[in-house]
Swiss-Prot record:
The gene is acma. Changing N51L: Retains 20% of cyclase activity with a total loss in stereoselectivity of the final product (racemic mixture of both stereoisomers). It is an enzyme of class 5 (isomerase). It comes from the Bacteria. Pathway: Antibiotic biosynthesis; daunorubicin biosynthesis; Antibiotic biosynthesis; carminomycin biosynthesis; Antibiotic biosynthesis; rhodomycin biosynthesis; Antibiotic biosynthesis; aclacinomycin biosynthesis. Keywords: Antibiotic biosynthesis, Isomerase. Substrate binds at N51, Q105. Optimum pH is 7.2. GO terms for molecular function: intramolecular lyase activity. Changing H107A: Retains significant cyclase activity (100% of C9-R isomer). Its EC number is 5.5.1.23. This is Aklanonic acid methyl ester cyclase AcmA. InterPro entries: Cyclase_SnoaL-like (IPR009959), NTF2-like_dom_sf (IPR032710).
Length: 144
């Protein structure tokens, strides 16, 4: 297994366990996920750790990612994952529904200096929203 694929699997393990004490080993100091730009200007391992905590807070401590497939090309890794969770925390203004859900995701990860630098992900928002019962937002959304 390549070092890049091993790093992506460590990323998945962090989301599954909530443990982020070693993320600087595989997350670049300038790591970014463009999906977070609306909420924060943070970068690097700190941003990644916040994202992991948000997933656990919003989708329960039992939330987990399952690897479906993983491929590598040069400085890029593409991971096909499924997120399983229960909606237990506020999400984009929607109160917790308590409902279980699962949703497929595609993650594209670019590596710089052997670490994950740029992370794009495309979750199945529509399918997840349906599984949550299509709740209406109750407040304006501001993710910390």
């Amino acid at each position: 297994m390549s070092e890049q694929i091993a790093a992506v699997r460590r990323m998945v393990e962090a989301y599954n366990t909530g443990k982020t004490d070693d993320v600087a080993d595989y997350i670049h100091p300038e790591y970014m996920n463009p999906g977070t730009l609306e909420f924060t200007s943070l970068r690097g391992p700190e941003l990644f750790a916040i994202n992991v905590a948000w997933v656990k807070k919003t989708f329960s401590e039992e939330a987990r990612l399952e690897e479906v497939g993983i491929e590598e090309r040069a400085d890029w890794v593409r991971a096909r994952l499924v997120l399983y969770g229960r909606h237990v925390g506020e999400m984009v203004g929607m109160a917790p529904t308590g409902r279980l859900f699962s949703g497929e995701q595609i993650h594209l990860l670019h590596f710089v200096d052997g670490k994950i630098h740029h992370h794009r992900d495309w979750p199945d928002y529509q399918g997840t929203y349906r599984q949550l019962g299509e709740p209406w937002p109750e407040t304006e959304h501001r993710r910390p």
